[in-house]
């Protein structure tokens, strides 16, 4: 994101932290400022977590515009909302088009009115590329905060009038677990760095246990994404 959107050749931890801080600021804004629809942190858990194990939200933030390329025309609510469903604006590398959404939490900041938000979400629901699971209603939790995003003076990000941070629970995040598993398997096959952990008091069995747990988590996400509605129809046949 830093390279593509902000034209930073070699992003440092400062660049990354400034981007992450915008996300954290958006999530906690409702605790600090007034808005039309304030969202409590406990509401995230209620709305985003359908099962205890499926509790890893995918975070997306828009717009991410460099200070040098700051638009004179501000992006509309519909545009920033649509940008939240683009893989390019995600904080975790995975393709939501290959998965299904279980729930979405949209946190708007700045010059935003509920009417525009409702229209933008209605448009999103009509898009074929954005799929929701069929065993729960297509829930969009919305938070609107009147405080516009604040940026660090002389920083990489442009000052914008409105922004949105989306927390979504999608089965596509399992791609991140698969990547992690693959990297672990390559290193663990050679027992790379294991001696350091064992030397500090860990047991080798803990690595195998953690690997099995992550494999089970991948399976859980896979099962959640299955078309339960279709499966029930096939089982039931023509019975009413």
Curated annotation (Swiss-Prot):
Family, as annotated: Belongs to the tubulin family.
Source organism: Octopus vulgaris (Common octopus)
Record-annotated active site: 43
PTM note: Undergoes a tyrosination/detyrosination cycle, the cyclic removal and re-addition of a C-terminal tyrosine residue by the enzymes tubulin tyrosine carboxypeptidase (TTCP) and tubulin tyrosine ligase (TTL), respectively.
Cofactor(s) it depends on: Mg(2+)
Residues with site note (Involved in polymerization): 240
Name of the molecule in the record: Tubulin alpha chain
Domain of life from the UniProt record: Eukaryota
SUPFAM superfamilies per the UniProt record, alphabetical: Tubulin C-terminal domain-like, Tubulin nucleotide-binding domain-like
